[in-house]
Design a protein with these regions (language model features):
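N-terminal alpha-helical membrane-insertion module
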Residues: 1-63
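Ser/Thr-rich, low-complexity intrinsically disordered terminal regions
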Residues: 36, 55-176
């Protein structure tokens, strides 16, 4: 199945079912009883609306970020990338601390890398980012960059974690 179609279906169910259940619970609390018709209308209507709106905006933003072929990986809110850099561990840490896109994030030094926590913004509830040294390959260092939402149930991030990974990659790799 097409990854975009899978995402539409995933959002449809994960938004529609809870909304339908909450609306049914409200009816039960108000003494109106349970109605399958009302549950299905709430579930399908809200699920369809949220799926069409959120996934379409997500796809549009990813296209703006340069994604041309959609896969399960680049549609995911958990982004990872392996990057080769001439910077050693201490140089990489210094470079990230001085980068404008990352300087507002809380940085914690790990044994083989650095962990960053972004704050809550109007775009997200924050992200957890890791840049971990995997190995040394000749004169270069191989880093594993990962970015994921702080809120684990997030299903759409509008490309925020992809931007985080790309910003770190640009900061620690030489520009041609």
């Amino acid at each position: 199945m097409n990854p975009v179609t899978k995402l539409y279906i995933k959002v449809f169910f994960q938004a529609g079912i809870p909304f339908g259940l909450v609306m049914s619970a409200i009816d039960l609390i108000n003494g109106n009883g349970f109605s399958w018709e009302k549950f299905l209308f709430s579930f399908i209507g809200f699920g369809l609306f949220m799926s069409l709106a959120l996934v379409s905006i997500h796809i549009h933003r990813l296209k703006k970020l340069g994604v041309q072929k959609f896969t399960d990986e680049n549609l995911s809110v958990r982004q990872t990338k392996i990057v080769t850099s001439p910077l050693n561990l201490s140089e990489m840490k210094q470079k990230l601390k001085s980068d404008l896109a990352l300087e507002k994030m809380k940085m914690t030094e790990a044994q083989n890398g650095i962990l960053l926590d972004s704050k809550v913004t109007w775009k997200s509830w924050g992200e957890k980012i890791g840049v971990i040294l995997q190995c040394k390959d000749g004169g270069n260092y191989v880093y594993h960059i990962s970015s994921k939402p702080r809120l684990t149930r997030t299903i759409i991030d509008f490309g925020k974690n992809l931007v985080n990974v790309n910003n770190i990659e640009q900061a620690i790799t030489p520009h041609s």
